[in-house]
């Protein structure tokens, strides 16, 4: 893979990257080794009182109680697969909110699929995450909390901001944003997985119909797939690629229906692994270069 030339960043971009913890060209400082706290030792117990001459009577131990068997959960009967190929935004968001085509719907509060605040608004960038967490499920929005702040900073360093969506504090009559400076944010899965339930390939396949319709409506010129589930949803027709570790999937261009696709790490992963932020920044620049040369 060809090496990228040194990044040409102005002072504002460097300040933005420093704020989110990205050190361009410099390795991340090694994390300090936490000092293990000294073990607290208990004081010796006082000497036992004089032993009584007569032993206390021995009582039989009570028989262990047997827990009643847990009631079995009723089997989930999935509904029909979503048929959303021709839906407009209002119908698409309603279909996602009421979808019961897989068991991901069992514990959700909200889906994260929303229409742009301005009817017909498009965006040159589409950013796809993995699955909603608890806070995203509560708010009904993709990329919130610290991970959302990190992603917003990364996008801002490229002169981008997330597209305002309905139901997220934006009024429908808000002024449109230039598509070249906008990023539409979504997830591979629209529902938060129920507790103790990991997403399966079949779940991603069900939700892919929504993602493909979002792509058709947003009309992005470049797609950033952040995380394994995102890559699986966007590039499901490339199993050999998806079988490779993330380190080999990223750093190069892929295609979805002719649209450039760049795979990179999820912002949630980057919060736990700061040393990978510089690689993610290179991936964003790769996507920006692909868009500029399109």
Report each predicted region and the residues it spans.
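A polyanion-binding, active-site-adjacent surface
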Residues: 2-294
